Curated annotation (Swiss-Prot):
InterPro entries: Nict_dMeBzImd_PRibTrfase, Nict_dMeBzImd_PRibTrfase_arc, Nict_dMeBzImd_PRibTrfase_sf. GO terms for molecular function: nicotinate-nucleotide-dimethylbenzimidazole phosphoribosyltransferase activity. Disulfide bonds: none annotated. SUPFAM superfamilies: Nicotinate mononucleotide:5,6-dimethylbenzimidazole phosphoribosyltransferase (CobT) (SSF52733). Belongs to the UPF0284 family. Gene3D superfamilies: 3.40.50.10210. It comes from the Archaea. This is UPF0284 protein Msed_0735. PANTHER family: PTHR38811, UPF0284 PROTEIN SLL1500. The lineage of its organism: Archaea, Thermoproteota, Thermoprotei, Sulfolobales, Sulfolobaceae. HAMAP family: UPF0284 (MF_01086).
């Protein structure tokens, strides 16, 4: 079931032709120990986006063995996205905004570059402008009625917090985490240092505090002529804030769809921010507590929560008649395949 909070995105998805785009990139912020669990070690976070893309499209990873996992061994949310999209007829596309490791599958390259540590400037101005311009052109040339955009970038909630803070919001208090223990004090320290050194000009400030994925997703939404679904949590709220600064008229055709685990996250304040921005918000209401696998049941305890467009992918499946029961069965089956492949 899709639950609408602001607007009526559940109806807007029904019977529409859709493209699912996964935007990947990296930021050197993910190398800060303790800032993210989107990889077994800080160094392996550089492989996570490429591996997520490979698994989403092909069902296996080439840049690493197995699939991306947290330090606790919990698998990537790409599992949820791939299972959901396998049940419906939808075009899939991988977009490289600036990943240090690129996937060994076909992808669209925006000619960006990996994000730097935001304390020293996240994305160079000329690179940022190039990413946004190329993403906008790509968006303009996608012809379906609905564009669902997911993301994979470890430490993306920290760069999102920085962008939101730079735009006048209490960013660290707003954003979620892939861990049940949101490392807010570490995020706050990094964000405050980055904001102190950021330029005063609003656009240049965004570039300084952002990562390549935030900029690319904003560009895609600004170029696309139909309804853009930002499939993610608080990172997509930061994208919405960027769109509001750069192309405010586009917000009318933008909505966020996330997971219930983001909506229920008591360490974040997504709903409050989205209301302020004036963006539509819904979530895919899936319960994994009855899954066959402990690695999936832990989602109900606040692990991982969202990523690789999981909420939007599940919502697409639900809008096309897939029941929650069948979706859980498919996710379980894909998880079993992963386990068997590693034996």
């Amino acid at each position: 079931m899709i639950v609408d909070h602001i607007g009526n995105l559940s109806d807007a998805l029904k019977g529409k032709k859709s493209t699912f785009a996964l935007v990947i990139g990296t930021t050197d912020v993910s190398l800060i120990p303790g800032i993210t669990v989107a990889g077994a070690t800080p160094e392996l976070t550089m492989f996570t986006p490429a591996a997520d893309a490979e698994y989403l499209i092909t069902g296996s990873c080439k840049v690493i063995k197995g699939v991306p996992v947290t330090p606790d061994g919990i698998p990537t949310p790409a599992l949820l996205s791939r299972a959901s999209l396998s049940l419906i007829n939808v075009n899939k596309l991988v977009v490289n905004a600036g990943a240090r490791v690129t996937p060994k599958i076909p992808f669209v390259d925006l000619h960006g570059e990996p994000g730097r540590d935001i304390r020293k400037g996240g994305v160079r101005k000329e690179v940022a402008e190039n990413i946004i311009a190329n993403a906008t052109v790509l968006g303009e040339n996608l012809s379906e009625e609905v564009l669902v955009v997911g993301e994979s970038i470890p430490a993306g909630t920290t760069t999102a917090a920085a962008v939101l803070t730079g735009l006048g919001f209490n960013g660290v208090e707003i954003v979620s985490s892939s861990s049940p223990n949101n490392p807010k004090e570490l995020k706050r320290k990094v964000v405050e240092e980055a904001v102190r050194s950021a330029p005063r000009d609003t656009t240049e400030r965004i570039y300084w505090l952002a990562d390549p994925v935030i900029l690319a997703v904003a560009g895609l939404a600004m170029g696309f002529r139909g309804l853009t679904i930002l499939a993610g949590g608080t990172q997509m709220a930061a994208v919405s804030a960027v769109i509001k600064e750069l192309s405010p008229e586009k917000l009318n055709s933008v909505g966020i769809i996330t997971t219930k685990w983001i909506i229920n996250d008591t360490t974040a304040r997504l709903m409050e921010l989205v209301k302020t921005l004036g963006v539509k918000l819904s979530h895919a209401n899936l319960d994994l507590s009855q899954s066959q696998h402990e690695g999936l049941r832990v989602y109900e305890r606040g692990f991982v929560k969202e990523g690789v467009g999981a909420g939007g992918a599940m919502a697409l499946a639900m809008a096309n008649g897939v029941t929650s029961e069948n979706l859980v069965k498919k996710i379980d089956a894909f998880y079993s395949d992963l386990i068997n492949a590693q034996r």
